[in-house]
Amino acid sequence: MPITPEHIRATVSEYLVAHPAEKAALSGVLEGLDRGDDLTGRNTGPLHVTAGAVLVDDGGDVLFIRHNVFRKYLLPGGHLEVEDGSLMNAALRELGEETGIAAGVAPLSPRPVHIDVHDIPANDAKGEPAHQHADVRYLFRTTGPVEVTLQEEEVSGWEWRSPDTLADATLRQRVLAAIRTSS
């Protein structure tokens, strides 16, 4: 079942109840939904929704992957697929595709830990103009040993890093707070 505009709106609205100061940052998502834009496809509009996974291990470290296109370490995540059904499922699918981790993880909350709107440069090889991603990030914790098997077409490395290395201050603060609470 595809991710519906209603699901995206409900997820963003619930997120904004917990984080009302972020309403302006997410206005493009809400305006796109109000216009009836398809925010689920990678080739739609100046902004579309993506899903990301913040995976924390038993030691409190966060999994980063080296993204081949951007040539830097990022959190696992990517574009939505028709079969995802929910944004959390999309985040789990992306985690599994990029790292091979399909089991041994559990969400720490049914709500996103963070929604980050960021610019994506044009990709001439894929025929994609510059656009924005509204990356809906879910926080997961390992529930046992996990084995990483990279999707080498998109990913060329992985590292467990301290959550202190998360570049976004808001995400870093929320992940650190969740780790303290769940320990």
Task: Cite the ranges covered by each PLM segment.
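NUDIX/MutT-family hydrolases
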Residues: R137-A178
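Conserved Nudix-box catalytic region and its N-terminal flanking loop in Nudix hydrolases
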Residues: G60-I101
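Acidic, metal-coordinating catalytic segment for phosphate/diphosphate chemistry
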Residues: E14-G52
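Predominantly extracellular/luminal regions of secreted and cell-surface proteins
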Residues: M1-A25, T99
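Active-site segment of metal-dependent pyrophosphate-handling enzymes
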Residues: G100-V146
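N-terminal strand-loop-strand
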Residues: L39-L75
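Compositionally biased, intrinsically disordered linkers/stalks adjacent to structured regions
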Residues: I179-S183
